[in-house]
UniProtKB/Swiss-Prot annotation:
Keywords: Cytoplasm, DNA replication, DNA replication inhibitor, Metal-binding, Zinc
Protein name, as recorded: Replication initiation control protein YabA
Family matches, as Pfam families: YabA
Gene for this chain: yabA
Gene Ontology biological-process entries: DNA replication
Record organism: Pediococcus pentosaceus (strain ATCC 25745 / CCUG 21536 / LMG 10740 / 183-1w)
Residues of the signal peptide: none
Subunit structure comment from the entry: Homotetramer. Interacts with both DnaA and DnaN, acting as a bridge between these two proteins.
Amino acid sequence: MDKKDLFDQITEVTRNTEDLLNKLHETQSAMVEIMEENAELQIENQHLRERLKQATAAENEGTKNTKYGLSKSLQNLEKLYASGYHVCNEFYGKHRQDEEECAFCLTVIYGDR
């Protein structure tokens, strides 16, 4: 092998090494971008989970069912009904005679929920 062939091989290896190094830098840059995006998405995901948790907690507070699975508003209607007044659309506010039962009122209080 003469000196020129040896020099050409070294030059080719050097060029290949530089190409490989450039590809490595490109890959590293792409990896950094992906890792940054991943970190941002994880933070955003965490914030969204916290907001969802707060929204769910607020919703549960607002519709918290108590006695017999009735909400506060239905409990108020139940108290009015127990006091002897109609809470149905037909006779709302009228006094119930002789504590009679009203199917309409009972449907409003205990019906489909």
